[in-house]
């Protein structure tokens, strides 16, 4: 890149160096003035900084026909079926989100979130459960981590800890591994369609499990 000396006006060609820090010192070959140049953010560092911040903006929440998300889920047990459009770090996603009646046969499952993962190139699903205190959580399985074969895996403990820290959620041990608690209680009233903050948290969890390059 080229920079202009503030003293003599000479143009200086600067070779970028990966020497750490956000600035580097160069000397004007004409007058000897020291100039501090702010280094441009490299793509690798840009991606790293982007992953430290997950911005979710809900654009639309639309109630749809109460069809079942799974073959073994009764349609009459679907309390709400939503289509949600969201802007996530500048990318538009469309989610299908179901609220399921709390029943023993569903083993605590109360929410189902589906969307197309850009990383996996296919539709991916995340189920959310409640514990005996009606606290909403998501299990350690299934998900994906960056750079691995695109198949369902149980996320490593380190990745779960990273997600919990970045999203501000609590991590606890459960009977099937780690649980990521959203800090929300399950309730049928108000319904999910009237709880945009909960919808945002459900989406953030889905992103964390299925779009590893975003967080």
From Swiss-Prot:
Xref: NCBIfam families: MJ0042_CXXC
Domain of life: Archaea
Protein name, per record: Uncharacterized protein MJ0042
Organism: Methanocaldococcus jannaschii (strain ATCC 43067 / DSM 2661 / JAL-1 / JCM 10045 / NBRC 100440)
């Amino acid at each position: 890149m080229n920079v202009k000396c503030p003293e003599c006006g000479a143009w200086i060609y600067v070779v970028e160096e990966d020497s750490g820090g956000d600035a580097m010192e160069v000397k004007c070959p004409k007058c000897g003035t020291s100039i501090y140049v702010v280094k441009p953010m490299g793509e690798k560092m840009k991606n790293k900084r982007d992953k430290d911040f997950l911005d979710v903006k809900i654009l639309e929440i639309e109630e749809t026909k109460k069809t079942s998300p799974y073959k073994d889920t009764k349609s009459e047990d679907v309390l709400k079926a939503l289509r949600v459009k969201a802007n996530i770090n500048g990318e538009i996603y469309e989610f299908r989100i179901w609220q399921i009646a709390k029943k023993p046969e569903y083993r605590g499952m109360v929410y189902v979130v589906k969307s197309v993962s850009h990383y996996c190139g296919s539709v991916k699903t995340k189920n959310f459960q409640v514990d005996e205190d009606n606290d909403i959580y998501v299990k350690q399985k299934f998900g994906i981590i960056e750079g691995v074969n695109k198949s369902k895996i149980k996320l490593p403990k380190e990745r779960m800890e990273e997600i919990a820290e970045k999203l501000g959620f609590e991590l606890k041990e459960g009977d099937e591994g780690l649980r990521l608690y959203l800090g929300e209680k399950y309730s049928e009233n108000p319904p999910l369609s009237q709880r945009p903050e909960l919808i945002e948290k459900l989406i953030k969890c889905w992103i964390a499990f299925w779009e590893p390059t975003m967080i």
